[in-house]
Regions:
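Alpha-helix capping at helix-to-loop junctions
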Residues: 134, 162-163
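Histidine-centered divalent-metal-coordination microenvironment in nucleic-acid enzymes
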Residues: 145-162
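Terminal catalytic/cofactor-binding subdomain
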Residues: 1-142, 151
């Protein structure tokens, strides 16, 4: 059976700065993104994303929480100038997702292509880590799903389906 739909894979990577347990993971994640982008001549400029339909303070029932009582981490509609975000030449997106670097594959139409471009994301991250290793203490990335301290992250498969 042939699969005929648009799909993609997003992978969030765990991040650690060796020997520095107090390192800011958002800054370290930004270093991963900008190091790779710069090494490839990709300008790490902010892409314009349309968040007009998003309501980060609305729950599943449709009720809105007031901004004044929301925790700052819930105000995700406010742009953070420290976050790095680039679109790669293969159509993938490499960016900081909260406190993790994330590789979002290009949209594809076959499972084989989804796996191919997910593997490309691993190579992107490997190259970024190798380049950062030349500037101690370097950075370690993990393709697992928890850091043992309560933070979790992972991989998301995405499929375009008719309703």
């Amino acid at each position: 059976m042939t699969v005929r739909r648009v799909m993609g894979i997003e992978t969030e990577y765990g991040i650690v700065v060796p020997g520095d347990p107090s390192a800011n993971p958002m800054v370290a994640s930004g270093d991963v993104v900008t190091t790779y982008a710069t090494s490839r001549g990709i300008r790490p400029a902010r892409a314009s994303w349309d968040y007009a339909d998003e309501a980060p303070l609305r729950d599943a029932r449709g009720f809105d929480m007031g901004r004044g009582i929301a925790h700052p981490s819930q105000l995700t509609d406010v742009e953070d100038p420290t976050l790095a975000n680039v679109v790669l030449t293969n159509g993938a997106r490499l960016y900081v997702d909260h406190a993790h670097p994330e590789y979002s594959s290009p949209e594809v139409t076959t499972p084989r292509d989804a796996v191919t471009w997910d593997r490309a994301g691993e190579l992107v991250m490997r190259e970024a880590v190798a380049r950062l290793a030349t500037m101690p203490p370097g950075i370690n990335l993990y393709k697992n799903n928890t850091d043992g301290k309560g933070s979790s992250y992972g991989t998301h498969e995405n499929y375009l389906m008719s309703r």
